[in-house]
Swiss-Prot record:
The keyword DNA repair does not apply. Keywords: ATP-binding, Kinase, Nucleotide-binding, Phosphoprotein, Protein synthesis inhibitor, Serine/threonine-protein kinase, Transferase. It is an enzyme of class 2 (transferase). GO terms for molecular function: ATP binding; eukaryotic translation initiation factor 2alpha kinase activity; protein serine kinase activity. InterPro entries: CC_SR_Kinase, HRI2_3H, Kinase-like_dom_sf, Prot_kinase_dom, Protein_kinase_ATP_BS, Ser/Thr_kinase_AS. The active site is at D417 (proton acceptor). It catalyses: L-seryl-[protein] + ATP = O-phospho-L-seryl-[protein] + ADP + H(+); L-threonyl-[protein] + ATP = O-phospho-L-threonyl-[protein] + ADP + H(+). This is Eukaryotic translation initiation factor 2-alpha kinase 2. ATP binds at L177, G178, R179, G180, G181, F182, G183, S184, V185, K200. Transmembrane segments: none annotated. Residues 171-588 form the Protein kinase domain. GO terms for biological process: G1 to G0 transition; negative regulation of cytoplasmic translational initiation in response to stress; signaling. The gene is hri2. PROSITE patterns: PROTEIN_KINASE_ATP, PROTEIN_KINASE_DOM, PROTEIN_KINASE_ST.
Length: 639
């Protein structure tokens, strides 16, 4: 037993050393990335300033600046620091550099004054000048003698971080709702209008994707206007340092909002875009996470949750980044001991700048999402659902379809990350567009209330290029899902279409709107089939990905089963369009369970014979639909 414990202790020690080494390596890589971005942004700011000096015409100076930067980008000196969206950040750098020059001139002036003062001898006490001269010792910088204390006071970051922050001045931060590959999401209150919002922060330090792609989600949100799509309010960019960022307040009662992206996932059901490690690069491609409790397609490391109704244990996984002080500092007799690697990393941290810029996206705050709702519902209901519940959930699904159809047809985009955690539920009124009745199952409340489902988290959205191939860039190809990599967790493979999973083995893939159709088919099945355990859910969702539905589900839902199998066909060309899904007859608005007053009045004026004829016609229409759908099921089973 002693030998076993000693052996285990040795293994733990080796593991700890390996973990520390990896942490230090990631820290250095992150620091190098920050230094490179810092330098490129400063160079770009200088170039813009020079171009403005060479030509007083603003339009011509902009063209000159763009041409020079584009040329430098081709040879690898710059990336996309010159894009219009980063003009405010470049302006901050220009102001900071101007301030630094003023500091340096003042330091030189004071240095010259000290030189003249020290040149005068003091006859009363000759020895007093030695400690003074030692304190004011000089060192050489490119042949110029500069006093250390003067040079040490010169800093670029002090000016950058002293600028007023719109976020700090205008918003009160309540809690961290979630964090992930495309940023962190916070629950905030605007001090001016008093309203509460979801604020997504994207820190450029952790982004290894191009700047233009960082702004893609913002531009997509800005042009969307639909009741079943999350609402966008504003966005802006600020320069920041670690010292100026607000402290993170993590609340276990936080609300689930659009992750975000991603943000992007995170809960006891299924994670979206959250918490990439330092080694995982962030691109606009799909990086898939496993579904907790699912027979994993792709392994992941940590998960997090910010759903207000998800079990509190899920919040324990929202860990802060590894603290190097904890992993590399030892104590012995109350004496702190630093190992060599940690001392080296401390030196690197001192020399590298920590400045970055943050993109703020102000969006609608939703206090619930479909994933959290399904968790609550499954505690109260079991399969099969009653007729009323089926109608409530099909009405809900119809509104979800409307939102995704708007994304496809209204703004010509493909979401690529449709799943329950990215479908948000906002409280609404019966007369609001896109609202449906639903039982919340909050606090044992079984009363119906009106909610509006909203599609959110557009961090993985892409343009729908009809009849064209979407070529994957080198960056995308090298950061698509790695089945052996446990650090990749953007997106969830459970709901992802097969062609997305196949993208890792091909440089060209035809990404169409049918990607979202597949994901919606998975969501429909989950809406109509309550699960009692995560294992049951995992097994049946994976079976559906293979084209199999439970026999008891098919018996209860013949038409719905056909629709689900149609939507989740492996071949995207065999999947229906969302318009075909809406017109198939299964998602007709409910006119029986919650009719409008006008409908009740008009119905009362119909005679009995007319009502019977309407019922018989509807019955015949449904029989014909069942026959068609059965033939489709047989066709799918014989493939």
């Amino acid at each position: 037993m002693r030998f076993f414990n000693a052996h285990k202790s040795a293994e733990d020690g080796n593991y700890s050393e390996t973990t520390n080494a990896i942490s230090l390596k990631n820290e250095r890589q992150s620091r190098d990335l920050s230094v490179n971005k810092h330098g490129r942004m400063l160079l770009t700011a200088l170039l813009e300033n020079f171009c403005q000096l060479y030509d007083n015409n603003p339009a011509k100076s902009k063209r000159l600046f763009a041409l020079i930067c584009h040329t430098l980008q081709k040879i690898g000196i710059l990336e996309e620091e010159y894009i219009e969206e980063l003009a405010a950040v470049r302006s901050n750098y220009q102001d900071a550099l101007h301030h630094l020059i003023l500091q340096a001139r003042e330091a030189i002036r004071l240095d010259d004054a000290e030189e003249r003062l020290l040149a005068l001898p003091d006859p009363t006490n000759v020895f007093e000048k030695f400690p003074q001269e030692t304190a004011l010792s000089k060192f050489s910088v490119d042949g110029l003698n500069v006093r250390q204390f003067r040079f040490r006071d010169l800093t670029l970051e002090s000016w950058l971080q002293s600028r007023n922050s719109r976020y700090i001045e205008d918003f009160e931060e309540y809690s961290l709702l979630g964090r992930g590959g495309f940023g962190s999401v916070y629950h905030v209150r605007n001090k001016i209008d008093g309203a509460e919002y979801a604020m997504k922060k994207i820190n450029s330090t952790f982004q290894q994707m191009s700047y233009s792609k960082i702004f893609r989600e913002i531009k997509c949100l800005a042009k969307m206007d639909h009741p079943n799509v999350i609402r966008y309010f504003s966005s802006w960019v600020e320069s920041t340092t670690e010292a100026t960022q607000m402290p993170i307040v993590m609340s276990k009662n936080s609300s689930r909002v659009l992750g975000t992206s991603s943000y992007c996932d995170v809960n006891g059901m299924d994670s979206i875009i959250f918490e990439p490690t330092e080694s995982s690069a962030l691109t606009d491609d799909i990086l898939f996470a496993e579904d907790p409790g699912t027979e994993s397609i792709i392994s992941t490391s940590r998960k997090s949750s910010y759903s207000s109704t998800t079990e509190s244990s899920n919040f324990e996984n929202l860990e802060s980044p590894r603290n190097l002080h904890d992993s590399n500092v030892s104590t012995f007799n109350n004496t702190t001991i630093l190992d060599d690697d940690y001392s080296s990393s401390m030196h690197i941290s001192k020399t590298g700048p920590t400045h970055s810029f943050i993109i703020y996206i102000q969006m609608q705050l939703c206090f619930d999402d479909l994933e959290s709702y399904l968790i609550r519902r499954n505690h109260f209901l079991s399969f099969p659902l009653c007729k009323e519940q089926i109608q409530l959930h099909t009405d809900l699904f119809r509104m979800i379809i409307n939102g995704v159809m708007y994304v496809h047809e209204g703004v010509n985009l493909i979401h690529r990350d449709i799943k329950p955690s990215n479908i948000f539920l906002a409280k609404s009124l019966p007369e609001d567009r896109g609202s449906v009745p639903l039982i919340s199952y909050n606090d044992k409340n079984d009363l119906k209330e009106y909610i509006t489902p909203k599609i959110g988290d557009f961090g993985l959205v892409v343009e729908n290029k009809k009849n064209t191939e979407t070529a994957l860039s080198f960056l995308e190809r090298n950061h698509l899902p790695n089945l052996q990599d446990e650090t990749q967790h953007i997106g969830t493979a459970t709901y992802a279409a097969p062609e997305l999973l196949d993208a890792m083995s091909s440089q060209h893939n035809k990404f169409t709107k049918k990607i979202d159709t597949f994901s919606l088919g998975m969501v429909l099945f989950e809406l109509l089939h309550p699960f009692q355990t995560n294992m049951e859910r995992a097994t049946k969702l994976q079976d559906l990905r293979r084209g199999n539905l439970p026999e008891e589900f098919v018996e209860q839902h013949i038409c719905e089963s056909s629709l689900i199998l149609w939507m989740t066909a492996k071949d995207p060309t065999k999947r229906p369009s969302l318009l075909e899904v809406l017109n198939c007859g299964l998602l007709l608005p409910n006119q029986v369970s919650m009719p409008n007053i006008s409908n009740i009045v008009s119905t009362n004026h119909l005679d009995v014979e007319t009502q019977m004829k309407l019922i018989m016609d509807e019955n015949q229409r449904l029989r014909e639909q069942i026959a068609v759908l059965r033939s489709r099921i047989q066709h799918l089973e014989t493939r």
